[in-house]
Amino acid sequence: MVHDGNLYAAGILRTETGENYNKGVDGVTPLIAGVTTPEQTQRLLAHLTSQQELFTPVGISTVDQSAGYYYDNGYWNGSVWLPYQYFLWKSMLDLGYGEFAEKIAKTALHAWSQETDFSYNTFELIQIESERGGWFHQFSGLSSPLVVWYHSYYKPGNVTVGFDTWLEEWHFSNDYSSARIRYKTSRVGGLLLAVMNEEYSDYSVTIDGEPAQFVQRIPGTLEIRLSQWQGEVIVQAK
């Protein structure tokens, strides 16, 4: 952003050739803040999901790959950082984009596993060009999002929501074939992930006694759409 002499916003900061200097992951952070209009949400998602722009085989790039100032082997520019993947993943749950949320998580888990299987190190970042880890090799703080993703999709008894939903309580049966979850949310239409027993292929889900919309993209992991501001979710194997 360029400011005038009175420090008021005067326009977009651009390169010498006129290109927007904010064509990077920072430019989609309004999605994380939850302040976008429906039209803005769709425009930002188009940049975020495009494989020619921000989405790469190892995750969401820090800088748009189509930008004139993109560099494919930098420390920040040209790399994937897991904390940003985490923030945007949580935001996708808020927005109700479960398929893309899962893609973010699975891509990060694969990229990390690929490097760790090879080197047994947890690096600061994943470089897009080489798909290898880079810089400090014992950066354990960045492993926390990976643990969260794994638990959110594969650990029975786990419940996950976005930033805008509060879990009041949750209880699972001993064999994870049923669950009772109470929540409050400031965003109707967001998602709740509940990891159940994958040995049961069919489940019923209600919110305050009414049938709820849900899908299973991963066996046993239910992606439940929250249709009201607060309620009690009941999950039961059939």
Would you name each region that the model predicts?
Residues E168, A212-Q213:
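Short, isolated positions in well-ordered beta-strands
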Residues M1-N6:
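Gly/Pro-rich turn-and-neighbor structural signature
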